[in-house]
Each structure stands twice: as C-alpha cells, then as structure tokens.
C-alpha cells in the first residue's frame, strides 16, 4: 500500500479489514478518517450500538463547550455526598464520602480511568438534556445518553446509551478541530485521552513509540476503543465490537484492526 494513491490505500485497507473481520466472532463496526487528506472508510459505521464508556467523550465535549461559553468553570468544586456511589470502573467509590473534586478533576478521572461516578457527577452538573442537545447540534445521529453510568435501562432503548463508530470518529474530529484552533480546551481534551490508563485494544499490537490518544469502553459482550493516532499521516480510528464471547476476544479484534491501519499509514516505520 506504500506509495499508492489515497484511494488505492483506502480500498486495499478496507478489503484487508473486511477479510479479517469475516473470520472473527461477534459483530464489529469500524470507522477510520485521515485528518490531513480528509478521507476515510466505514464498515457498519452507522450501526447504532451500546456505547459503553465511549459516551463519556460526548460528556467531555459538552463540558468544554459550557466552559467556553462561561457557563461552567473547570475549577468549580463538587462534593461527593453519597450514600449511593456508582460501581464499576473508577476510584471515587473507594474514597470517603464528602470528598470534593473540581470539574477538571472529575473529567480527568472520567477519561483516564473511566470513573463512572465522575461521569455521573458531570452528567448531573451539565444536564442529560443539554448533553443530548449537543449530540444533535454536532450531527451525531446515532448517539444518545439515556441513563447514568451503571443505571438499569430496563430494556428500554430510550433509557440506554447508544453510539456508532462514525459518530465516535466525528466526536474525535470535533476534539481535534478544537485543538487545531489553538484552544486550550481542545489541547486539554487530547491530553486527557493521551493519558488513558485502560489498554489492551488499539495499542495492543503497536510499539511503544506510536502515539495514541484514546478512550475505551466495555460491557458484557461489548469491547470498544476509539482514538487519535499521531504521525506524518494522523488519523482517527474507532472499532466497536458486540456479541463477543469474551472480553479478550473483542480486544484482539480491535488490536488487529488497529495494526492493519498503522501499517497502511506508515506508523510502524
């Protein structure tokens, strides 16, 4: 694929990815976008899927928009009063009730360790309606926040959290475009994603020198990872897997799709 046109690269890469996915269990949606060439490909990219923690990207973008408009301040403090502390990923649940965090700290925890309580505190502060309105304004047709993290949706679609591979890549584009304008908020969002501590997906088969800023998400049978890849040909990649027999199987799929893209775009040297 080296030395070919962008179209030839896309066609060959998409074929390689499709051939690989045909052999894998479960279902996988992929969306990839080259930032410089402004071209990409999508495999099932508009399929509406359980978002898992990828929905936290939308919460982060809405927080930064509220800060930009002067309706929120990253230094604003919120006390975790309990007694119901959200389970699942995170460290806030391990701390004493009454601990105080700034919005900046909550966002940091929400992204780098996927803290569910931090996400819920931010959702309460911003408002679920406002977050969903942000999704609509951004043109995210398959993305919806219907519940707090770890809350029971009771099988009702409108009470669950959804997204798609294409919507996730679009959100990452918004973050990159915000940073490109010189906005400190844009650079901050990328710095949070670059400090991601949950690995095993996009970075699984890549050497340490490859720079990736990303966000993972997982539920029973669901493994997602989406990120920004830096290099001479920077690109965005979202790989969403569902109906997985085990978590590691989904992560293996994500890792191989990521490796195929990294090879195609010359990230491996």
PLM segments and residue spans:
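Structured C-terminal helix/loop/strand segments within mature extracytoplasmic catalytic/sensor domains
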Residues: 5-24, 36, 40, 125, ...
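Mid-domain, small-residue-enriched loop/turn segments at the edges of structured enzyme/sensor domains
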Residues: 24-27, 120-177
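Short, conserved catalytic-motif segment at the N-terminal edge
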Residues: 25-48
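A short glycine/serine-rich beta->alpha loop
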Residues: 42-50, 92, 96, 157-158
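Flexible glycine/proline-enriched surface loops and loop-helix/loop-strand junctions
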Residues: 43-44, 102-105, 113-118, 148-156, ...
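Conserved catalytic neighborhood of penicillin-recognizing serine enzymes
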Residues: 85-120, 161
């Amino acid at each position: 694929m080296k030395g070919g046109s962008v179209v030839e690269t896309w066609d060959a890469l998409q074929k390689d990815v499709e051939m690989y996915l045909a052999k894998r269990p479960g279902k996988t949606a992929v969306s990839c976008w080259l930032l410089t060439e402004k071209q990409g490909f999508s495999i099932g990219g508009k399929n509406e899927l359980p978002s898992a923690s990828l929905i936290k990207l939308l919460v982060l973008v809405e927080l930064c928009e509220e800060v930009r408009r002067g309706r929120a301040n990253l230094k604003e403090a919120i006390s975790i009063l309990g007694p119901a502390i959200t389970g699942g990923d995170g460290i806030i649940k391990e701390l004493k009730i009454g601990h105080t965090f700034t919005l900046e700290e909550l966002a940091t925890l929400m992204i780098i360790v996927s803290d569910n309580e931090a996400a819920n505190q931010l959702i309460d502060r911003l408002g679920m309606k406002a977050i969903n309105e942000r999704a609509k304004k951004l043109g995210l047709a398959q993305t919806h926040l219907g519940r707090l993290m770890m809350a029971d949706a009771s099988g009702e679609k409108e009470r669950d959290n959804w997204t798609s591979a294409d919507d996730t890549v679009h959100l990452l584009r918004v973050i990159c475009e915000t940073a490109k304008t010189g906005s400190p908020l844009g650079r901050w969002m990328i710095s949070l994603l670059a400090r991601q501590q949950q690995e095993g997906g996009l970075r699984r088969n890549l050497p340490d020198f490859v720079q990736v800023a990303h966000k993972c998400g997982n539920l029973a049978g669901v493994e997602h990872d989406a990120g920004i890849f830096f290099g001479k040909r920077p690109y965005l990649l979202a790989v969403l897997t569902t109906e997985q027999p085990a978590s590691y199987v989904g992560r293996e799929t994500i890792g191989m799709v990521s490796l195929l893209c990294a090879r195609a775009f010359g990230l491996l040297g």
